[in-house]
Amino acid sequence: MPELQLLIFTVIGLALLFDFINGFHDTANAIATSVSTRALHPSHAIIMAAFLNFLGAMYSTGVAKTIGADIVKSAQHVDEHVIIAALIGAVVWNLITWWFAVPSSSSHALVGGVIGAVLVSVGSDGLNFYGIGKIVLSLIASPLIAIVTGCLVMTVLFRIFGRFSPSAINGKFKKMQILSAAMMAFSHGSNDAQKSMGIITLALLSGGYIDVFEVPTYVKVLAATAMACGTAVGGWRIIKTIGGKIFKLEPISGFAADLNSSMVIFSATLLHLPVSTTHVVSGSIMGVGTAKRVNAVRWGVAQQMVTAWVLTIPCTAVMGAVAYQFVLWIFK
């Protein structure tokens, strides 16, 4: 088998592994609130999330184009060795944070891995700093927006339903949480699965297998399937952190968090902007908790999560740089 074909197959395999890990790593984003409030049985929640993640992943390719075309100046600055190294850095980081039950951003991990590998390969001239700035800005702004809008959504719900008894409210919102969890799962797939689509398409472009950056249908199906399979495996360690350690959720607050998260994420998808679903969901829960009372949020846990988020890009950049040297040693 020619070396280029071997490299392309390696990229596709690692990208699908990244998507699979992203699925079980980020399953918590789609179902943590509905499981923690017992609106859905865990197994039912996972089946629903897997199916809707698949449908969401097939929705569009705008985010894939942003990831594949905006981090580097052109496909000439990226070869398969760089892409493999970036994926290794992202996969290793995701596994580390999953093992320690720390909600982390797969988006940050992938961006950091690409930056580190490109810097070692061709230097800073290969990076599109305008595109990177746009991506990083969306990653930073999205959880802050989620906090504010989550607080507003919860405040509105309190105003509308505040005169009813808690038991009556929570009984109704338990059923509505099924809908909000479904919306969350679809929006998660519509944004997160596209990141690996963008990486695979970039590899196909740099290898000369396609002439323009358009995501092939088979790439969409492969990425969507990998995400759905990962979702079916589930990430129970992180579900516990997101579902209960930040703020004790009730059905009404769980509904508000899911509704808000799905709106923020899907809006980003329509704008072709990659966001961290982990950050957005966590931000929504913080905002919902703040609407109840500020000290209801466990800010110590939130601070630990923010620390992990801040460290993700620099750590994965280093991992991507080291992995690039390793990949060169293996393939050259």
Residue ranges and their predicted role:
Residues 1-332:
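Multi-pass alpha-helical transmembrane bundle typical of ion/small-solute transporters
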